[in-house]
């Protein structure tokens, strides 16, 4: 079973590896600038989490919690660990917290999306 640790500031010991995965996994136009990252981390409805499998970092999630539903803004699995079911496990655990959850997926319609 995956475990997760909440990251509440850029000073967190896990922030650097999360930020590196974030930069690799999402196109530049979907990424927050540094100040916007700090603001999101301080928002009470936002949760940035580092996910681990037996101590090995496997991915990240950035979720918002609202009255009655959750919204997954970012979800990424380390590129060296993809196709091993981690995304499915991570998503399943998030859904136990908020069964009604929105996961936005951008269609692969541009060269940058591919």
Residue ranges and their predicted role:
Residues 50, 55-76:
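Conserved beta-strand in the GNAT
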Residues 39-50, 71:
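A short helix-loop-beta-strand connector motif used in the catalytic cores of GNAT acetyltransferases and
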Residues 81-93:
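Conserved acetyl-CoA pyrophosphate-binding loop and the N-cap/start of the following alpha-helix
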Residues 75-82, 107:
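A short, internal acetyl-CoA/4′-phosphopantetheine-binding micro-motif in the GNAT/acyltransferase core
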Residues 1-36:
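Short amphipathic alpha-helix that is part of the acyltransferase structural core
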Residues 29-39, 51, 86:
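Recognition helices and adjacent regulatory flanks at domain boundaries
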């Amino acid at each position: 079973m995956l475990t997760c640790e909440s990251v509440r500031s850029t000073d967190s010991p896990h922030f650097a590896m999360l930020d590196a995965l974030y930069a690799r996994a999402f196109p530049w136009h979907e990424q927050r600038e540094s100040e916007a990252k700090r603001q999101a981390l301080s928002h009470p409805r936002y949760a940035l989490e580092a996910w681990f499998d037996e101590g090995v970092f496997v991915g990240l999630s950035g979720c918002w919690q609202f009255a009655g539903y959750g919204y997954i803004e970012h979800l990424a699995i380390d590129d060296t660990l993809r196709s091993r079911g981690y995304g499915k496990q991570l998503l399943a655990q998030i859904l136990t917290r908020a069964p009604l959850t929105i996961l936005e997926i951008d269609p692969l319609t541009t060269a940058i999306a591919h």
